Amino acid sequence: MKISVAIPTSSLQDESLKIDKTRKISVLARACAIFKIDTIYVYNEGNNGSDGSFMTMILRYLETPQFLRRRLFQKVNDLKFAGVLHPLRIPSHNTPTNAKKIIAGDIREGVIVTVKGKKFVDVGINQLIQFYGKTPTGKRVTIQFKEGYPRLSVKEIDNSESKTYWGYDVKERSNLFSLLSEWKGNIIITSRKGKIVTKEHLEKYTKSEENLLVVFGSPEKGVHEIIGGRMNKVQNSKSLNFFPNQATETVRLEEALLGTLAIINAQK
């Protein structure tokens, strides 16, 4: 079972400064990496569309290994405060730069470059490796070494072939209802209006082979308010309250994400 999350663009509206928005997204990314989230869906909610593209860029930037960022991201204003971001330190990021330590079977992230008409892959070892895969120049790719040092030949693979958590995808959605109505799998809607979560509730999902989508509302609207009367058209969903008897008026997204995923993870 793979777990994905859906979070609203409006979750940044509580922060007025871009540096604070950047820090908040960093916490969200860390929470998703800790609990091995497969895909982060950023759905549009509210009127500030620029927050959506900003959130998406920072989430993708954080998930990208540090040694590839210079090739994949231009210097733009949205990355002005990248220095405050906390690194994810997931397995795809923790790779040695010494080519002599590479052995057959190692998996890495790289970016495709073209030199004199030939394609190479840069995997952060201060030398380019010839590449014969289909990924176009300028794009990120997952490779596996067929031969270690000194021959260093590689093949293109799907990142799902890694035996360890390799990172999350980030996808934008224009609205939440389209995501929920098209989702193939189980859905948990986090809500104060839901049933208080129990071990029995969660085991139905954690023991299932179906993928799970965990949905979070906005600072001003819960998921039921966002969806409105179309809620009954959402299949395989259940509303659960992960914070019963909360003392605070609201639970911020970063708090809800960490708390909810920790509870789900404990039942896996």
Where would I find each of the regions flagged by the language model?
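Post-transcriptional modification and biogenesis factors for structured RNAs
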Residues: 1-268
